[in-house]
């Protein structure tokens, strides 16, 4: 174990904490990428089952992860028909009157991803 003089203790502690924070950030970024990729695949699968049709809507689901100096954020979205997701998930009005029932295919996946992400972040902190 290295001996640190008392006048340099604050520098040593700061250095250790910066390394620890860097390790956590790296681990959380990896978890975010993994969860986003898993989520896009899960929404594709649930959209095929819930919506049917030609498959264009289901195949359009993708994810994107952005990393800045202070944060890593992930987004799962439909690149081919982005406006359709809300209408299919929640239902919509018909031209001649009446409503079309929603087909929830995003919300169940979202709930599972939130649980997986929280668990992944906890593991990322524990392993750092």
Where are these regions (language model features)?
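Aromatic/pi-system hotspot detector in well-structured domains
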Residues: 86
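Short, Lys/Arg-rich flexible segments
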Residues: 1-79, 90-128
